[in-house]
Amino acid sequence: NFEGMDMVKVYTSGSLLEDREIPVEFQQTVLSECHELGKELIVESRCEQLTEEKLQWATSINPKFTVAIGLEAYDDEVLKFHVNKGFTTKSFDRAVKNLQKFDIRVKTYLMFKPPFMSEADALDHIVEWIAAVAESSDEISVNPMNIQRGTIIDRLHNDRQYRPPWLWSLVEMIHKAHHIIHPNGGTNGDEDQVSRLIVHPTAGGKIRGSHNCGSCDTEVVAAIERYAVSGDLLEFEGIDCSCKQTWREEISLERCLPAPLGISLPRRGDRAKVLRSA
């Protein structure tokens, strides 16, 4: 029962259009019922499932829906060695070309600060990746890394070889990428809008998610989430904290020191609390 809801998201952590995992009958039901109910449908898919044949079948049932692709990085080296994604940027480009051929909306997911990357490198890379996919994506969703228990990144975090991103890095990323999304300095809905940039820090403000010193986190997270709706840089006006200088110094040092994993230290709490953090 989707009464009162305009949008239906079907995320399978893989692909709704994967016939070996998802019965074709269920795929057809999702596509047809959302179309008949007039609901905006967003499905997740890997690149290899987005063939012309599959998309022709899907659009014959539901001619208007959005496909979300977890690209993570527009960089083959990062895709292979940092996130073990299993496809290349060429695969992504080919999938997007097919989606555009059938007039299907594209939502691209990018990862901010994947493992084995410093904060400064992550900041430089993400802006390049946004620029690379902006023209071909209706929406770009940047997901800052957060620590999930039992994963490799959890082990690195416990060994102090990885720290989740600073919230200030996300703010800086938005400022640097804004002109890519809005070449004339506009906001969401303006004629100059190339794509829509969405940033939603999972566990934002917590030690296992993107965080600052603890004093300013709530305010900064709220501003980031407001920007995703408005696309207006004024959301960040007047937001400041003493920890911003620490962030600046860390970024500066990482740009001039041979520290491939970065130098970021815990921003708050003692070692025991960091290890016990949820």
Indicate where each model-derived feature is located.
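Conserved C-terminal portion of the radical SAM core fold
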Residues: 90-151, 171-201
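Short catalytic/ligand-binding loop motif for oxyanion handling, primarily in non-cytosolic enzymes
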Residues: 17-19, 76-79, 115-117, 149-151, ...
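Active-site glycine- and acidic-residue-rich loops that bind
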Residues: 48-51, 84-86, 115-128, 163-168
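Core AdoMet radical
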Residues: 1-22, 33-50, 64-92, 139-143
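Distinct, well-ordered alpha-helical segments
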Residues: 20-28, 51-59, 119-120
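Surface-exposed cleft-lining segments at the edges of enzyme active sites
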Residues: 42, 77-85, 111-121, 156-161
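Acidic (Asp/Glu)-rich catalytic clusters
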Residues: 2-3, 31-35, 56-64, 97-101, ...
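Auxiliary Fe-S-binding modules of radical SAM enzymes
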Residues: 146-278
